[in-house]
Amino acid sequence: MKKLIAALLTILTLMLSSCGDVSDVSVLFTDSQRYSETELNNVAEAAKSFFAINYDDCTLFTIEYNDAHNEQVREDNLWEFRCSFEPKSLTDVLELSVTYYDNQDSDNTNSLITETYYMVTLDNGNWEVGDHGRT
């Protein structure tokens, strides 16, 4: 388990290099035994690719593997991404939720934005980001 956590922390540190100034990285495993190391690495790689393309300005990136969606967002950060990978079926679909404050509104107020993506396994075992919704 320690090797798995160390490996994922290394992957997350590398993936954050394209994510601007990163002030904190944390990984929480509450039910990681449900997934193999390969599955967790595949999800991390898919998330890395997705966030590198879509979220260049993040300052805090937290990735969690757990069963309970965590919607905590710290108001003192301009951008905070807290990503929860939640099993929606046995092993083939995970929900990735991103919650952040966006102060780019025309009236200069902070809006709490939640974007949801469904990550699905492909026939070759890789993960990709599927459907998307925003609230």
Features from the language model and the residues they span:
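Intrinsically disordered/low-complexity terminal segments and short unstructured peptides
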Residues: L9-L12, V98, V120
